[in-house]
């Protein structure tokens, strides 16, 4: 699947701050003078979700359809599906700055899930999965980033044994605690006809 390779600051200027997309910020103020139509609001929220999680349009459609099939609030189910992706879980631990850098670590084969090497960034983790980061890459990450933090992530537990970092998924993420600036209902309305 094709990923966005263009200027990240232009996207930040257009859509606002997206912490999973980039840690950069725009020096120019966000232009709010444009009047958007109803469709424009829906499209903007959908694009925020896509860029923040680094997924393609086709992947997002599959996640929306899967969330609709599950019982409960479709918006919460959609965010839970996206938050349980392996690249997002690594980003939430705080040792990589963006979801894209987590994708790179995974695709280079530095991550093991339940004792098996996983090189698919969109791998869906489940409760009680153990994610282990290889020792060599952990040392270089420690040099760049002094501390790991699972801020707003009560569903992840970090353990460090024998220079290995183990992340355990204890339960589903609490969507209210994560704090999103994305209106998920507008995204679901955008895909209501599809």
From Swiss-Prot:
Signal peptide: none annotated. It comes from the Eukaryota. It is found in: Plastid, Chloroplast. Belongs to the universal ribosomal protein uS4 family. It comes from Bigelowiella natans (Pedinomonas minutissima). One of its GO terms (molecular function) is structural constituent of ribosome. One of its GO terms (biological process) is ribosomal small subunit biogenesis. Keywords: Chloroplast, Plastid, Ribonucleoprotein, Ribosomal protein, RNA-binding, rRNA-binding. One of the primary rRNA binding proteins, it binds directly to 16S rRNA where it nucleates assembly of the body of the 30S subunit. With S5 and S12 plays an important role in translational accuracy. This is Small ribosomal subunit protein uS4c. Part of the 30S ribosomal subunit. Contacts protein S5. The interaction surface between S4 and S5 is involved in control of translational fidelity.
